[in-house]
Amino acid sequence: MARREKNPIRATVAMNIGLSDSLLAFVNNYVKALRFSLFWMKENVKNPNEKGALSKVHEGLYEKLRKEYNLPSKVTEDCYRDALAIYKSWYNNPKKGRFPRVYKPTVWLTPKQSYTVDLEKMTVRIASVGELPILGYPRNLKEYANWKMKEARLTIKDGKALLKVTFEKEEEKVKPKDSVAVDINMNDIVVGKDDTHYVRIPTRLHDAHHFKSLAENLQKKYPRRWKQNRRILHRARSFHQKAKLIMEDYARKVGKWVVEIAEGLGANVIKLEDLKNLIKDVNKLPAEFRDKLYLMQYRRIQYWIEWQAKKHGMIVEFVNPSYSSVSCPKCGHKMVEIAYRYFHCPSCGYENDRDVIAIMNLNGRGSLTLSTAPQMRDVAPNR
């Protein structure tokens, strides 16, 4: 049997499907069966982590769920597996808290046996419900036509039926060719491979920080009332949410743009900074800078760059960013700042912007052997 890929690429796609009486009845029966299964496990399965717990649950619940709740064979298995996962999550939580209740109308579905999606006819077939049309879907749905379908979640909300399908594919094994480096900072993101081939992407940090400041000013204006007054609380929350959504949307778009730039420069390796110690001393920073650092979501941006790169068959490598903005990319000596974010090397005379210096240094680091990568110079850097 082939060994399973450790880190497959996954994407979740939400589709709006047709709502019918049979679908509503199916979801209602599933939720009732899920509630019953949870309380049955509380009484009969003292330790869900012990060996044979799933077999015990199957013996105790399978026939009962099928007959009393009129669930198809595979959906019955999905139901008690779903309940067991919820029960385990509660059981393994040290604080425990209240025993979980099921209110939201959601159904766990297994591909092929519980549901199938036909992307050509734009239909979904669900066991015991039948064929339903796909009414709405994202524009990039066709990109996942060759991906493997995994488990899905069917949700009823605000009179609409949403099917959230997880697609999965294995990472492509590619041979490294050329590479680009990405330098992320608060003003812009620079992508390139040298001081002539690079692109600057402005950030939206200023917009996000503006809405966060509006929320904080509102809280300062009403220091006691903002928690009790529903209108003030709602407005403050909306400002915070808007700031968060701006940066989340920006991070997703940057992932696509970086991959497009890399393809345009003929590279299939993207080098990112290893940010392990990014906020190690964050409490020592000024308050405004600290706020912007949290808002910027460096790791979120890197996550979407890495995800898009793997989706398009590229390699991502994390390299040490130490002194990448102040070391001369030509001779390795420490550079001197002669203007705002502009550095000069006293040894060889090279001058450039610190962001361009950073991508040149980052692109020369890493363990990958690239056919067109510049050779490392035998110079001891002045660190």
From Swiss-Prot:
<comment type="similarity">
    <text>In the C-terminal section; belongs to the transposase 35 family.</text>
</comment>
<dbReference type="InterPro" id="IPR010095">
    <property type="entry name" value="Cas12f1-like_TNB"/>
</dbReference>
<keyword id="KW-0479">Metal-binding</keyword>
<dbReference type="InterPro" id="IPR051399">
    <property type="entry name" value="RNA-guided_DNA_endo/Transpos"/>
</dbReference>
<keyword id="KW-0815">Transposition</keyword>
<protein>
    <recommendedName>
        <fullName>TnpB-like protein ORF383B</fullName>
    </recommendedName>
</protein>
<dbReference type="GO" id="GO:0006310">
    <property type="term" value="P:DNA recombination"/>
</dbReference>
<feature type="binding site">
    <location>
        <position position="348"/>
    </location>
    <ligand>
        <name>Zn(2+)</name>
    </ligand>
</feature>
<dbReference type="GO" id="GO:0046872">
    <property type="term" value="F:metal ion binding"/>
</dbReference>
<comment type="similarity">
    <text>In the N-terminal section; belongs to the transposase 2 family.</text>
</comment>
<keyword id="KW-0238">DNA-binding</keyword>
<keyword id="KW-0862">Zinc</keyword>
<feature type="binding site">
    <location>
        <position position="331"/>
    </location>
    <ligand>
        <name>Zn(2+)</name>
    </ligand>
</feature>
<dbReference type="GO" id="GO:0032196">
    <property type="term" value="P:transposition"/>
</dbReference>
<keyword id="KW-0233">DNA recombination</keyword>
<dbReference type="Pfam" id="PF07282">
    <property type="entry name" value="Cas12f1-like_TNB"/>
</dbReference>
<dbReference type="GO" id="GO:0003677">
    <property type="term" value="F:DNA binding"/>
</dbReference>
<feature type="binding site">
    <location>
        <position position="328"/>
    </location>
    <ligand>
        <name>Zn(2+)</name>
    </ligand>
</feature>
<feature type="binding site">
    <location>
        <position position="345"/>
    </location>
    <ligand>
        <name>Zn(2+)</name>
    </ligand>
</feature>
